[in-house]
Amino acid sequence: MYWRDRRKKSSSLWASCRALGYVFAGLSLALLLSDLAVRSEPADQFENLTGKLLVATPEMGDPRFAESVIYVVKHNSEGAFGLVINRPIAKGPVGDLLKGFGVESKDAKGEIIIHYGGPVSQNQGFLLHSDDVLLEDSTKVKDGIAMTSDPKLIEAIAHGKGPRQYLFMLGYAGWAPGQLEGEIHAAAWFVVSSDKSLVFGQEAEKKWHQAIDKRQIPL
């Protein structure tokens, strides 16, 4: 379900991505949680965090996640999978993005922003989007938000037929069983409810502060 880069070098967008060290590779979404190599001690039972936001606290010790806001796409006994929603890294014509996937799309219009989705497998692409448009492989998450990893949805966006709200990411954040719970217990993250206005807001630099304003008692 991951998008595959054909290694075409025709776009300035991909040139800027390559400068940041990002390329694409094809892998199976079913392996996301099972491939997490690091295992943690089981933590106390936490509520399911699917569809919620993880907000890095000032005590976050990992600089890769400093002031990050992560949308949790999946959280279960096998671990957790999420996407950083406040780290744009590049912008370019959506037609160039499609060419990078080997998709020739005539009359593709508009530009698209590429976001850093997390430090794991930064060669993998994802669309987090409103669920008004869904494909066969789309995953409905919660509260009107879905995730898709099919370039056909990018093509639909390029022709004005895509979802009303979306973010395109490279990479993801992944946790082994008990790992995320341990980090929350260590006060690296706190958890807040999500809403589409925050997730898909255009001012990425404000999202962390907006999430801070939504702060609840840590789970």
Which role does the model predict for each range below?
Residues 2, 21, 30-33, 37-219:
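A short aromatic-anchored loop/beta-hairpin motif
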Residues 6-24:
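Bacterial N-terminal signal peptides that target proteins for export
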